[in-house]
Amino acid sequence: MPIDYDKIKNWPFPDVEQSYSEKDSILYALGVGYGHDPMDEAQLRFVYEKNLQAVPTMAVVLGYPGFWVKDPASGIDWVKIVHGEQALRIHRPIPASGTVIGRTRIKALVDKGKDKGALLIQERSIVDKKSGALLATLEHTTFCRGDGGFGKGDPAPPSPPAVPDGTPDATCDLPTLPQAALIYRLCADNNPLHADPAVAKAAGFARPILHGLCSYGVAGHAILKTWCGYDPAKLGGLSLRFSAPVFPGETIRTEMWRRDGNILFRSRVLERNVVVLNNGVATINP
């Protein structure tokens, strides 16, 4: 069944209310690798309840509407979808605990053509329930490889900026734990691809892979450490394109260039010298 453009654009997302505790914030931080140096007081502020602060990229696991594309009524061939890009704008620091409302809408549905797939762009607003303040806005771009050719769609979004040539202005190497995917799945995505060796093998991988949004959090850590002095209020936004999977236990090197007040970056795994995150842009607040 082909995609029905109007049905998808008007998909009835309910508001998602989510309460979370300081333990949840600590678990997310541990999942994306904070605390790997337990003597680093700058990292401890995200993994120890004394003066606890939330990692800014934790917004990606709040107010999640669920895996709705699996609903047969969507017409989407969910088996063939790939998480292509992720963007985050942070309007206010994420509280270390609280209750938020996630409000999701379909921002765009782009028909790339028959046999070329489609782009599905979801926008999610994260609102603090108590104050009504907008905390963050997320864009999740999904490449629907089996769903092109429905004949109606929105204009394609502009391509993200390319990473500069030449030597980066800064690099940051961060390790991932062999059990990182098993920790991160407790925060959000419990897809067995990230835990079950048999499922990973059936999908064509030698072993379970790391969640893309966990790798995203590691890149955010590199930006926060290198350009923000671990001050969450200084990170205004983070966008990137996923280009290859990461295996838990690999080391992620983030290469960064300062351009026009932003940080352009990409990340590669050192063990295989493969770029895994690309076309990254981080906005740094004054």
Which residues make up each language-model segment?
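Generic structural "secondary-structure junction" signal
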Residues: 46-48, 83-84, 90, 96, ...
